[in-house]
């Protein structure tokens, strides 16, 4: 996993307001200008009206130009949110700890979800709160033993050999999870295209990825 600390520092440029804005957006929900004004007032120990529009929007524009955030308008309110590609790198930079979701694929061996769950139950460093697995629609009814924190998404069998479709399906789910959870990805199971898609997503979003061996050992992939 690539260290983007230097790149982040070049964008922040030591400007405290940018740090505050990014940390506030890491809370996982889009923020209105009034939310950011309040966060900046708290950080600088000022009154709300002591935070100027220029301070907020100049720094928002700098972060948006750098590709870290994007803003949009809903009715009369303008919102800002982090771009998904920067959520985990910014968590790493600010040392923000988020609950973990482990994502993987269930191939011909339907026990993978049980193996991973038991493996991480004994892991001191990573304790996933949730598990999300993708699998073929033909596995419906063949997988059992689910716990409440395990979710399975079924993909039509004919899509599993279409790389772009698999990538799109998985990507849509990852984007929904990222604002609130750190995602770690097991890339060793499923079709070739599924493994490729999971690996690409781990690189795109700066996520930790690993391989579960046949003897249930976890090998972390260091990019």
Model regions and ranges:
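Long, low-complexity, Lys/Arg-enriched
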Residues: 1-182, 193-223
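Conformationally flexible catalytic loops at phosphate/diphosphate-handling active centers
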Residues: 185
